[in-house]
Amino acid sequence: MKNFAYLNGPKVVVIGGGTGLSTMLRGLKKYTHNITAIVTVADDGGGSGVLREDLGMLPPGDIRNCILALRNTEPTMEKLLQYRFTDGMLKGQSFGNLFLAAMNGISISFEEAVKKMSEVLAVSGKVLPVTLDDVKLKAKLKNGIVIDGESLIPKLQMKEKSPIERIFLEPKDAKPVKEALIDIMDADEIILGPGSLYTSIIPNLLVNDVCEAIEDSKAIKVYVCNIMTQPGETIGYDANAHVDALFLHGLKSLDYVIVNNGEIPYEYKDRYKEDMSQPVSYDVESFKQKGIKVIEKDVLAIRNNYIRHDEQKLAEILMGLLE
């Protein structure tokens, strides 16, 4: 009966990338298997960037993490696919990236490769790239400088000490994966974040027709705000500024914003402060004026000495909105 309930659970679409998205997926899959993760393919750094350059494929890293978060296999399989080589020509590369690269080699498209890897790992729900186009992410800073490439944006923004004015994709007419649009339209709940605002979440909104599908969908629309500001992207931002950036880049409406009101231990505040990162503040009244409800909850977790969202608490809140 439990599996039946999962299979017939609410239809949830999550949009983003990075570790924040995969963390949340681990919590959500305990409540429903009707999950679609729509993932950015703008990454051009690290092991993903190397494979993108060498093999001409779309970056596998964020998609790999989402697949592993939704997998139903032995823990050893996740350890294997997350393993990073420490020596030789493959140093820094993850086996999971190579697995997906090999799957891409025997498939007619990257979309099919992702589906095949998902089948092998008995994924609950589905993982979709937002586009199959070879897109590059660029950022224009307020001082007029244009940064070329996702991996360079945080570094050069910090160097220039000028806020991000807006980001954009090249080509500007990137076509969405049709199945992603269908699932957005059919969803009960659409969740943006958590994750890097400019390099994980907003790139998805820049793909043609994605914002329009979100707006036309009858789903509840939720933004999960980051707990801490991010150097190179959101220094000095409060939650309202995060949402303003989403609207600036095409999002048209939100129903809820989830913010953390849990107490962050002083030692972590101090350590993050050294990197110019601080807790994200929020103004409930300002959100009310925009017609957005604020959910203030303790969603804080400390994992491996890093501040993260607690996937269980977050999933309970998100599922509670559908009751």
UniProtKB/Swiss-Prot annotation:
It is found in: Cytoplasm. Keywords: Cytoplasm. The keyword Glycosyltransferase does not apply. Pfam families: CofD (PF01933). One of its GO terms (cellular component) is cytoplasm. One of its GO terms (molecular function) is LPPG:FO 2-phospho-L-lactate transferase activity. CDD domains: YvcK_like. One of its GO terms (biological process) is regulation of cell shape. Belongs to the gluconeogenesis factor family. PANTHER family: GLUCONEOGENESIS FACTOR-RELATED, UNCHARACTERIZED PROTEIN YVCK-RELATED. Required for morphogenesis under gluconeogenic growth conditions. This is Putative gluconeogenesis factor. It comes from Thermoanaerobacterium thermosulfurigenes.
